[in-house]
């Protein structure tokens, strides 16, 4: 049986993705990446990236789908790979986009490595995008989601061929 690591945000999209993969016969394991200590920053009980509420929502969905669930703590990596880069760029007068670095160096790179460590076959997210294998070029292509109004392919643009 193939195994899928489900990147769970606590939202509807990743929850539905988990259910769909189970229906396709995959053995699924849910995971949420803890990137920021919201509570230490005084942000409490708000729906922000990586909040405790998000973690609990994801854990609840995983429980209902009878799948194991993990929280990967990457807060130190987030500070180094995202916040330090953001501050450095901002001090130079640039207009940094921390989400790009977070997606590239943490959300997808670290999650991909964790997937390999866990001997899983694939990572599944709730992003609206398509990955298509092009026979002519021998490459995977990242394409817009079928519903243009919900397309999130831009979030995934930094993925390598191996990650796609």
Give names to the regions the model predicted:
Residues 158-164:
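Internal nucleotide-binding/catalytic subdomain
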